[in-house]
């Protein structure tokens, strides 16, 4: 299998941006390879080497997690970066509109973490609504989710460690099993780390993989990827309308979104198949 040299990995080189899954078309490597991809903060270190036809950049993380300098430079003086790469991959549609050399791809961690353990399936639904929220508070998006979890904690089953809630899954690893917090539920409140066009993560697709309807705050363009009859956009007071009857009325959309997730590639396979191979 082909190998691609990566720089600045925000994930383990043995796997991919999607938990412990691996790309279908190539393996990542830290050793010298013909194809090179500079990721997130390393995009600037790539400016010190000459452009070639197999040299790419990838903004893998969200706007907050990836260095702001990369995005700010693209908005102010895009040639400073683009002149050194064949293409730059990102989920940020605002950046994609700047230049044809900036190619949209899924964000890192776009597929369900559960895919590393088992396939998508419609699980038995015995509970109404959950929410997963970690105690992380180092970004505006984290703090917004924490605040909303505090407001909603008496109206749903809260998991993730925030506000004294249970952390689902075994151990202390980065990719804990969320089954306890997702599988038995009809609905789950999902707040992404940020809200901008093109950005969604496993927080959303974890729900679709187990037949859960997300109560969603995140990508304004999410209808371009999923059936909106199987998504409820978060609004104040929306939890009061959640019932088993409502869930059952959306079964077709639930199954449709599950199939869409089953057929969705990880970010790496998407940009490799469309722009590199």
What are these regions (language model features)?
Residues 1-59, 63-158, 162-277:
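Pol beta-like nucleotidyltransferase catalytic core
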């Amino acid at each position: 299998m082909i190998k691609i040299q990566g720089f600045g990995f925000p994930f383990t080189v043995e796997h991919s941006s999607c938990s412990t899954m691996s790309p279908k078309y190539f393996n990542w490597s830290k050793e010298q390879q013909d194809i090179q991809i500079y990721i997130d903060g390393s995009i600037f270190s790539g400016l010190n080497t000459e452009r070639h036809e197999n040299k790419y950049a990838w903004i893998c993380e969200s706007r907050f997690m990836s260095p702001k300098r990369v995005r700010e430079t693209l908005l102010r003086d895009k040639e400073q970066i683009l002149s050194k790469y064949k293409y730059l991959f990102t989920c940020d549609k605002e950046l994609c509109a700047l230049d044809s050399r900036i190619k949209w791809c899924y964000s890192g961690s776009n597929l369900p973490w559960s895919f590393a353990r088992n396939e998508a399936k419609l699980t038995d639904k015995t509970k109404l609504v959950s929410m997963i929220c970690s105690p992380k508070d180092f970004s505006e998006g984290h703090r917004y989710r924490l605040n909303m979890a505090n407001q909603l904690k008496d109206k749903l089953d809260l998991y993730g460690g925030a506000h004294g809630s249970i952390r689902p899954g075994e151990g202390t690893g980065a990719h804990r099993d969320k089954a306890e917090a997702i599988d038995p539920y009809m609905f789950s409140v999902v707040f992404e780390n940020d809200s901008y066009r093109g950005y969604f993560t496993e927080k959303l697709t974890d729900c679709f993989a187990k037949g859960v309807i997300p109560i969603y705050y995140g990508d304004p363009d999410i209808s371009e990827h999923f059936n909106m009859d199987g998504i409820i956009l978060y609004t104040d007071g929306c939890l009061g309308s959640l019932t088993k009857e409502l869930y059952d009325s959306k079964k077709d959309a639930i199954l449709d979104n599950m199939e869409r997730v089953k057929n969705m590639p990880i970010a790496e396979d998407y940009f490799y198949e469309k722009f590199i191979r």
